[in-house]
C-alpha cells in the first residue's frame, strides 16, 4: 500500500509558485498542495529561475507574481530561454498592466488576479495543465 501512495505522489504535477510576499507564498503553496499538486516555492524571480533549473523535468507549470524583486516579466523571459515550452501563469493585483498584456502576446499561458480564490486558482491551473 505504501508503494501506491508513493506512486501517486510521484504522479502529482509539480508546480513552482513564486511570490516575494511570505504570506502569499505560504498560502499559495498550501492551496496547491490541497488541490493535489506537488508545490515548490521561490521568494523572487531569480530564485524561481534557480528552482526551475534544478527541477525543470518535473515542473509542469510556473506561477509568477508580477511585482517582486527580479519581477515576473524578467523571470518569464528567462524561463522561456531555458525551456520555450514551459507553461507560465502570471499572478498580479493589477489587472490593467501593459506588461501583462505583452506577456500574453509573448506566450504566457494565463493571468490570475490577486487575491484569488481556491476555485479560481484550481480552474486556471487545471486549464493550463490540460492545454
Language model features with spans:
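Two-component His->Asp phosphorelay active-site signatures
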Residues: 20-22
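Alpha4 helix (beta4-alpha4-beta5 surface) of REC/receiver domains from two-component response regulators
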Residues: 74, 78-81, 89, 94-113, ...
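Hydrophobic residue at a beta-alpha junction
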Residues: 42-43, 69-71
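Acidic, metal-coordinating helix/loop segments flanking the phosphotransfer/catalytic sites
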Residues: 29, 41-61
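Short amphipathic alpha-helix used as the core "switch/output" element in two-component signaling
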Residues: 46-53, 73-85
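Disordered, acidic interdomain junction associated with two-component signaling
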Residues: 1-14
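Active-site residues of response regulator receiver
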Residues: 64-65
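Charged docking surfaces used in two-component/phosphorelay signaling
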Residues: 26-34
Amino acid at each position: 500500500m505504501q508503494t501506491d501512495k508513493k506512486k501517486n505522489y510521484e504522479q502529482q504535477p509539480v508546480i513552482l509558485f513564486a511570490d516575494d510576499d511570505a504570506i502569499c507564498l505560504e498560502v499559495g503553496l498550501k492551496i496547491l498542495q490541497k488541490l493535489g499538486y506537488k508545490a515548490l516555492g521561490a521568494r523572487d524571480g531569480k530564485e524561481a529561475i534557480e528552482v526551475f533549473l534544478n527541477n525543470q523535468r518535473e515542473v509542469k507549470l510556473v506561477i509568477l507574481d508580477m511585482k517582486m524583486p527580479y519581477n515576473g516579466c524578467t523571470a518569464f523571459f528567462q524561463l522561456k530561454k531555458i525551456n520555450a515550452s514551459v507553461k507560465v501563469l502570471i499572478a498580479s493585483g493589477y489587472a490593467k498592466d501593459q506588461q501583462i498584456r505583452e506577456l500574453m502576446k509573448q506566450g504566457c499561458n494565463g493571468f490570475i488576479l490577486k487575491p484569488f480564490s481556491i476555485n479560481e486558482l484550481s480552474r486556471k491551473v487545471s486549464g493550463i495543465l490540460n492545454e
